[in-house]
Each structure stands twice: as structure tokens, then as C-alpha cells.
Amino acid sequence: MTETTTVHLLRHGEVHNPAKVLYGRLPGFRLSTTGEAMALAAAEWFGGHDVTHLVSSPLERAQQTAGPLAEATGLAIGTDDRLIEAGNAFEGMVVGGAGGVFRAPRNWWKLRNPFQPSWGEPYVEIAARMLAAVEAARDAARGHEAVLVSHQLPIWTIRLHLEGRSYLHDPRRRECALASVTSVAFEGDRFAGVTYAEPAGATPSDAVPGA
């Protein structure tokens, strides 16, 4: 009988970011008080699940999000660089408003190719590293469940890849809320589908896109 394995992709909780910058891979961005509550809600959501493997992006906000689940399950938090946030040329800049990066003519050349995209890490490279991380977690948790804590764009990109959809998309329409769970099911090595849940509810409408 073919064994079922589920790899859950948990997005980190809300980050303390009063300046509303696109923080990307920058250090020093940790969870807000609300984000810490989101991490607890996610850990509670996994209660009763057969989680035997827990791995996180190396970034602080992801490690913090993994913390409550590690405490609840007794699992050590592994770190996988393949789960890190996507590289972005606008890292550290303000995205929205009158002074946002999209309003400055000097930035328009970077926006020339939304298919790649020209402003950051190529989607094909994000998908490749995330797929490798997901398959490694599947192999480590055969017949059980694994949780990988990552970031919105990497999670959304691997979902698009697995479902055979175009990488070209509107970031505002990603189904990947803060502290959400995108669950990837496998029957043996075969991809069997994706389900989605929001243990902490929907992301606020004024959140920084892609954060």
C-alpha cells in the first residue's frame, strides 16, 4: 500500500515593520506581538497532526514562527537555506505610497520583465530550491507529516509549480496569508494535491506586499 506523506508549508507571522519597507532577507526584522500570537495559533492548529519533522528558513521571523510548534511537538528546529525569502532588488525600500519604489522612474527598468521577474530571484530558481526542500522533507517524514516554515513568495511559487500554473501573477492575489498553511500531499513520491488553511485568519489589507 502506498504511504501518504504531507509536507506543510507554514508562512511566518506578522513582522514588526512600522516603516512598511520590503524587508526581504534583511536582518533585524522579528515578529510583532500580533505575529507571535499568529505563531501560537498555527502551533495550535497542528495539534493532533502527526508532525515528525520541522524545518525553517534561517531568517529570524521564520525561526520565531517555528518556535511554538517546536515546543508543542518536542521537535528540534532544523534550518534549510532553501526555504529563505526570495531575493529582491527593492529590499529595504518602501513599496507603497507617494514615495514608493514603483513611482520612481529610476526603478522602472527593473520592472521590465514580470515573467522572470527582472527585479529579483528568478521564479524558476525559487521553484527549484523549494521543490528540493519539499522533497527532502517528504523523504524525512515518510508516512507522517513535515512542517517547513518559509515565506510568501517561495511558498506561492512552489504551489504554482506543483499545480502546473504560470509563474506570472498579481502579488495581491496570492493565496498565502500570514501564518497560513499550504499543505502538499504525496502518495509515495507522487504529488497528490494541495490544500490551504488560515489558522490565524486573513492578512490585513494594509500589509506590505510579499512580506
Question: Which residues make up each language-model segment?
Answer:
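Short glycine/proline- and acidic residue-enriched helix-loop micro-motifs
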Residues: 104-125
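Short beta-strand scaffold positions
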Residues: 56-57, 128, 149-150
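Active-site-proximal alpha-helix that buttresses catalytic centers in soluble enzyme cores
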Residues: 5, 10-77
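Acidic, low-complexity terminal tails and accessory targeting/binding regions
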Residues: 1-5, 75-79, 85-97, 139-144, ...
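Generic structural signal for well-ordered alpha-helical scaffold segments
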Residues: 40-47, 127, 131-139
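Short, active-site-adjacent cap segments at secondary-structure transitions
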Residues: 16, 61-63, 86-87, 154-156
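Generic beta-sheet signal
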Residues: 7, 144-152
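Active-site signature of alpha/beta-hydrolase-fold catalytic machinery across serine-
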Residues: 68, 157-161
